[in-house]
Amino acid sequence: MSNGGTPRSLPSSGQKSIQEICHPLSAEESARSRSPDVLNPGEKDLSLPNGTPVDTSSPASSSSLLNRLQLDDDLDAETRDLFVTVDDPKKHVSTMETYITYRVCTKTTRTEFDLPEYSVRRRYQDFDWLRIKLEDSQPTHLIPPLPEKFVMKGVVDRFSEEFVETRRKALDKFLKRVADHPVLSFNEHFNAFLSAKDLNKRQGLALLTKMGESVKYVTGGYKLRGRPVEFAAMGEYLDMFTQKLGTIDRIAQRIIKEQTEFLMELREYGPVYSSWSSFEEDLHEPLEGVSGCVSNCSSALEELTEDMSEDFLPVLREYVLYIESMKNVLKKRDQVQAEYETKLEAVVFREDKKTPMPTDVEKCQDRVECFNADLKADWDRWQNNKRQDFRQLLTGMADKNIQYYEKCLAAWESLIPLLQDKQDAKGETN
């Protein structure tokens, strides 16, 4: 996402005011500034962030750009010392329940681990346990979201191959985000999750811990007078971002529904020409060609619809959950600040002015400063991740659409020789 002009820095952290923070998909930002990223191809040669030019002479440039973006990500991996992947989902059936486990593989050079490699199996509730522990032990940090646990029965089969694969990708992304975090990745519970063969002994009262943590920050009895401007801007931006994502999600689902209905019509449409060809000796090949074209177009549309359902929508929903996590951290920060303001006010209005500042007030002030610093750092990290994620998402969407139209174009172009040959043969006969 390009920046519109020179941003006006806020006093304490350099964050933009809400008027200057633009949604990553908004056109308003480009309207304010003629950024090099949004110039027309005729005005400026397209290039990657590293300066490599992008060839726009053919539709294949989108695929090339997608591959180069992935190579840029591979370069970042050279500086990492902790690699985590989630794969190999397996279904387990017992007399009590049916569930899915996933293999979690870890490779690391960190001294906090006893071995350089681990391979353990975890189910969804283990991932949930980890997130609860991270929220409890790291309340000042933004914890990445997990995919939603519950699904509507009768609408989604939670044991279907498509659902399990979508969840696997989300769980893999969750662990990778934690592993890339400079603080969360060193958490003892994360270490246990990656290395312990059995988490049952470590899980303990996770639910009670979460309930206690919730009560601690929600029922503190302190009322915040007002958020600092930078945190107020964060809250307003999150509200706006939620609205934009919700709108895109609803429209995308309507598009998928319409594409699915169109796909069903195409599947009925093509065979009609094939059936017709059996009664037309002279038109047999052209009619069979049309039937094949429609069949190829329907297959291409099916792939496009599946990509939108399995790759595009999950990213939108992940960021909706991410926003909820960020809002929860903001609320916790507000509670800590409200507690500090209340205690400080009590000290200011006390009769004995010569008594030193109470220790609990100083500790509360330290908590506020720590919360602010951690939240600002996580906000910057989240913004960077968001830009990268949406850049890859939109580039991938463009690439898939180009492939779809290329396949349809090739299918219909293949029909032209059949029609021309038929016309030439008819002319020779006459």
From Swiss-Prot:
It comes from the Eukaryota. Transmembrane segments: none annotated. The keyword Nuclease does not apply. Gene3D superfamilies: Arfaptin homology (AH) domain/BAR domain, Phox-like domain. GO terms for molecular function: phosphatidylinositol binding. Residues 223-428 form the BAR domain. SUPFAM superfamilies: BAR/IMD domain-like, PX domain. Residues 1-66 are annotated as: Disordered. Belongs to the sorting nexin family. This is Sorting nexin-30. The gene is snx30.
